[in-house]
Regions:
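N-terminal capping segment at the start of a domain
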Residues: 79-90
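Short, solvent-exposed mixed-charge patches
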Residues: 395-397
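Active-site-surrounding "flap" and adjacent substrate/cofactor-binding loops of secreted or lumenal enzymes
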Residues: 118-133
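Bacterial N-terminal signal peptides
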Residues: 22-40
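N-terminal secretory signal peptides that target proteins for export/translocation
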Residues: 1-20
Length: 397
């Protein structure tokens, strides 16, 4: 029996809530199949399987042709995120970077303005933690398991930080388990198969660092004699001494630095933020493809496919990169009133789709475009959170 099958999908946001009615997800009427709107080299929704589908949950394919929403709706975005994460967690029974891993990490961050994270999320993370704790140590350092453990620890740390402001024993267990999966060089193993979120050991190391950064009291309370203290230092030294493979990785490093500046991972913080302004498109958004050369995203034939895209496709602003940058800059205490950030937020406000998603074309295949999920999580965080108290003053462009 599926562990969530008897639980209704609900939230507390009024008319747009998710609720199972007569065996059909009420939100599904928003997630309709879109007809072809022109030729751009992409498959159309009618040619694609649903993006998420499990029992009563059905979310149709993400496409570039999906109509824009008449106005920005945090309710629609939250509904899409909730349904997608539930469907993946119930169906796949695992942590994925692109869906429930991103949801677990980001969802608690906007709990103040959009309500608390659902209880099922923590229950799912706890079941995953217990399952991984039963594995032999060698099984924790294989395939993408180290990355999954990093997202698990980050999700629990985020929950504690934004819901309770204290570290739970479960988060302590998850962080310690995560470090059991650490590689000798301080990184965390990951196959370079599904960029950008599953692209390298470096990317996984930044997620692990973010997990610790979201629980600052935990790391500060580590005794020097605790073996984990040496492992944490190894992680910090890896990120300090290993050149970031591309600008995308540097954005994540900046995100870690926003929460744990004491580590000194980004020496010229303001210079790097200025570089982000320089990469901003004229419409106010950013393009993920502008943050790494095609060959830098991983092995396989991906580079050839990316190079075959038109210049317009490569340079087009997308929800993933724009949402990520706007969210990270707000975590860096850049004010909403900063002209360049304001342009980015305005792009997000005007580019949501009718389903509640933000569009972003996958770097990998033109089938599921799961990158739209993290795009929506980052975009909603950027639009829903208030900036942190300033610790660095950023100049106007």
């Amino acid at each position: 029996m599926n562990r969530y099958a008897s639980k209704p999908l609900r939230n507390s946001y009024g008319a747009g809530c998710l609720e199972l009615r007569a065996g059909v997800l009420w939100l599904v009427f928003l997630l309709t199949t879109y007809l072809p709107g022109g030729s751009n080299g992409l498959l159309h929704a009618g040619e694609l399987p649903p993006q998420y589908a499990f029992e009563e949950i059905l979310i149709h394919a993400a496409t570039a042709e999906e109509p824009f929403a008449a106005e920005y709706s945090s309710e629609a975005a939250l509904g899409y995120l909730e349904a997608g994460a539930r469907a993946w967690s119930q169906d796949k029974q695992c942590i994925s970077c692109h869906t429930n891993g991103s949801y677990a990490l980001v969802r608690p961050m906007f709990s103040t303005n959009l309500g608390p994270s659902p209880d099922w999320l923590r229950a799912f993370l706890m079941e995953e933690l217990e399952a991984y704790e039963d594995k032999q140590p060698e099984g924790l350092r294989k395939d993408i398991v180290p990355t999954q453990l990093a997202y698990l620890a980050a999700g629990l740390a985020s929950w504690d930080r934004f819901h309770h402001q204290t570290i739970s024993t479960e988060t302590d267990r998850a962080l310690r388990l995560m470090f059991k999966a650490q590689s000798e060089d301080g990184s965390f193993l990951n196959e370079d198969c599904w960029p950008p979120l599953e692209s390298s050991h470096y990317q996984s190391a930044t997620v692990a660092a973010l997990a610790v950064a979201l629980a600052p009291a935990w790391s500060k309370d580590l005794m020097p004699s605790d073996p984990v203290a040496a492992k944490l230092d190894r992680l910090i030294q890896f990120l300090k001494n290993t050149p970031a493979p591309h600008d995308y990785a540097r954005v994540w490093l900046l995100w870690v630095d926003a929460w744990m500046p004491e580590w000194g991972l980004v020496e010229a913080n303001q210079d790097w933020v200025q570089h982000l302004w320089d990469l901003q498109n004229s419409d106010g958004g950013w393009s993920m493809r502008s943050f790494a050369d095609p060959e830098k995203w991983g092995d396989g034939s991906r580079a050839d496919r990316l190079r075959s895209e038109t210049t317009r496709q490569r340079q087009a602003s997308d929800g993933h990169m724009t949402g990520l940058i706007c969210m990270v800059l707000k975590h860096c205490a850049v004010s909403d009133s900063h002209p360049s950030l304001r342009r980015g937020l305005s792009w997000l406000e005007t580019h949501q789709r009718e389903s509640g998603r933000w569009w972003a074309r996958s770097l990998n295949t033109d089938r599921y475009h799961f990158i739209t999920y993290s795009a929506t999580a980052f975009a909603l965080a950027a639009l829903s959170e208030t900036p942190r108290n300033k610790r660095v003053q950023f100049s106007e462009p």
